[in-house]
Regions:
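Flexible helix-coil transition and linker loops at the boundaries of alpha-helical arrays
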Residues: 61-65, 96-108, 134-146, 180-193
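Structural motif corresponding to the intra-repeat A-B loop/turn of tetratricopeptide repeats
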Residues: 82, 120-123, 157, 166, ...
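Residue at a conserved register position within TPR or TPR-like alpha-solenoid repeats
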Residues: 79, 117, 154-157, 161, ...
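Catalytic-site signature of metal-activated, phosphate-bearing donor transferases
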Residues: 1-90, 115
Length: 244
């Protein structure tokens, strides 16, 4: 399954504005940006060799601009895309330490940092993720993609030690319900579906394993109606089980 993300980027520029940087160039200007009703599809990151090509340029940029958290973010994201998760952690930590609160790439970087910690798993990574979630929740808790990640975090945390974390079981359900309450906001950027069909699907899974078939069917159906094929398959499997 391939996920789709949206992001806002400056591409329609006034005359005279130039790009700066040796890779992942950005407009070298401080003028204000305004949203436009223009969309463009981009599948370049599906290319398997893009990270290998970009990495030397990013390493050079990180050396040239050691105080710039943007290149630390790009180093971390590139290494993550190359499946070098452990190597990416150093760069994520450096990025998180230096990134200013108003940086446009801050939220994306934090979410990728958290997903990397969840993918690496283990008590230390879960503890680190929990600290970051607690610190960022007052601001990022208004975003569906952050709440979606919280649902995954609480699930992993509970499964890591059911006896110790059983009391956090309701947070799994609450996180996905909050995703649906917030809804989709493509103008914010982020993974498509975390405020709709993906959250509904995960709720369906949660209710199914909890033995609540009625609610599982309700949320699987909601997800399937949005065209999410895994939800349609789960609905079909549940129907077969119930007919036996």
């Amino acid at each position: 399954e391939i996920s789709v993300s949206t992001s806002l980027i400056p591409r329609l520029l006034p005359r005279g504005v130039r790009y700066g940087g040796i890779i992942h160039e950005q407009p070298d200007t401080g003028i204000e940006c305004y949203p436009l009703l223009l969309e463009a599809d981009h599948d370049g990151y599906l290319s398997g060799d893009k990270g290998e090509r970009n990495l030397p340029y990013l390493e050079k940029a990180a050396c040239m601009y050691p105080q710039d958290p943007y290149y630390r973010f790009q180093m971390a994201a590139t290494l993550r895309n190359m499946k070098r998760l452990k190597d990416s952690l150093h760069w994520f930590r450096c990025f998180y330490e230096k990134v200013p609160g108003q940086a446009g790439y801050r939220t994306e970087g934090i979410l990728l940092y958290l997903y990397t910690l969840l993918d690496l798993d283990g008590p230390a990574c879960l503890h680190e993720a929990g600290d970051i979630i607690g610190r960022e929740k007052p601001v990022l808790g208004k975003r569906a993609d952050f709440c979606f990640l919280c649902g995954l975090f609480y699930m992993k945390l509970v499964l890591s030690d059911v006896g110790q974390y059983r009391h956090l079981l309701p947070e799994i359900e609450n996180s996905y319900l909050e995703c649906l309450r917030i809804g989709e906001h493509p103008e914010q950027g982020g993974v498509v579906g975390t405020g709709s069909f993906k959250a509904a699907y995960n709720l369906g899974l949660w209710y199914e394993v909890s033995g609540n078939g009625e609610k599982a069917t309700e949320y699987y159906r909601q997800s399937a109606l949005a065209g999410f094929e895994p939800a349609a398959r789960q609905l079909k499997e549940m129907s077969v089980k119930m007919s036996r």
